[in-house]
């Protein structure tokens, strides 16, 4: 899908009540992620039909911020989010923070429907996959249909004329659309959670507990050791990687880029230094430097940063002793 025409004028301004787009309709885990942020309690929350459209809503300036899913603990990355941000959105759009929400998946039906009545299950493919074993055991042979979101599945079931349809959705969506939970907690793994990105224009200030995400396009893909040379840049500076994966660049068959999450913020000298080195050798795009959901990253970065500063002072002391010609 191509992005709508937009200009890099930045977001519309509304300090009192920011407009925040999210993957809708109401009742999605994405909305739960948005509502979990105290500083957005007064925001105008706008449900959008798809992930890419949510991103373009912010990119165009029609919304100040947006919230989209990026990774599930069981099913991995949400490729639509990665690809839209990496290849289609403008370079004025950045990740502002990450939000982690525990996943609570239930089988939701119209009131009075029994589990034995269910013939069709509807949900977003990521959610259906997280319940694969449960479905195979409890509803073998059931037809599984795709929707844009868990809440969209719940809304679809609420409007269905037949009683044999069920939605895999959170309890919030079941309540919102007048459905009953016929089976609760049907996800196959108990410690399931989903990570979300909040996106907006500009790069937010350093918090001390930050992560960054960068896309690296290899200049020479036919040379061995390409990934190793990229990883060595981070290792040499003591920067911890939290995630790395490859994605097709959409340019030609066999052409891949690396999307890397790592600890630290652009304002950190070590992070700025690794980006300089990468950009000198490869095509690089920074997707964001943003507040991390946990505080472990900050503690590690502070320790590494202190060691690096001490080493820099030592080198500066030696250089000060160099005699002038």
Language model features: what each stretch is:
Residues 1-325:
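Domain-level signature for soluble enzymes in the chorismate/prephenate branch of the shikimate pathway
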């Amino acid at each position: 899908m191509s992005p709508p025409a937009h200009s890099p004028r930045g977001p519309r301004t509304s300090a009192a009540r920011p407009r925040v787009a999210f993957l809708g309709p109401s009742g999605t885990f994405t909305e739960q992620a948005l509502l979990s942020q105290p500083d957005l309690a007064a925001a105008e929350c706008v449900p959008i039909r798809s992930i890419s459209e949510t991103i373009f809503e912010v990119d165009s300036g029609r919304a100040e911020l947006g919230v989209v899913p990026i990774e599930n603990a069981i099913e991995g990355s949400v490729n639509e989010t990665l690809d839209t941000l990496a290849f289609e959105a403008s370079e004025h759009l950045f990740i502002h923070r990450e939000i982690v929400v525990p996943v609570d998946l239930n089988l939701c039906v119209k009131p009075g429907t029994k589990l034995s009545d269910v013939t069709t299950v509807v949900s977003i493919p990521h959610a259906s996959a997280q319940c694969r074993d449960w479905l195979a055991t409890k509803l073998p042979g059931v037809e599984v249909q795709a929707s844009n979101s868990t809440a969209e599945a719940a809304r679809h079931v609420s409007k269905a004329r037949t009683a044999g349809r069920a939605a895999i959705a959170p309890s919030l969506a079941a309540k919102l659309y007048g459905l009953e939970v016929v089976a609760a907690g049907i996800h196959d793994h108990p410690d399931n959670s989903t990570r979300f990105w909040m996106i907006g224009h500009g790069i937010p200030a350093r918090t001390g507990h930050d992560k960054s995400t960068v896309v690296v396009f290899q200049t020479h893909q036919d040379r061995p050791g390409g990934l190793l040379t990229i990883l060595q840049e981070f290792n040499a500076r003591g920067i911890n990687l939290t995630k790395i994966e490859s994605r097709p660049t959409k340019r030609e068959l066999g052409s891949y880029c690396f999307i890397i999450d790592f600890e630290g913020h652009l304002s950190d000298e070590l992070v700025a230094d690794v980006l300089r080195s990468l950009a000198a050798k490869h095509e690089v795009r920074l997707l964001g430097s943003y507040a991390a959901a946990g505080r472990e990253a900050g503690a590690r970065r502070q320790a590494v940063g202190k060691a690096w500063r001490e080493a820099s002072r030592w080198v500066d002391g030696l250089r000060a002793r160099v005699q002038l010609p």
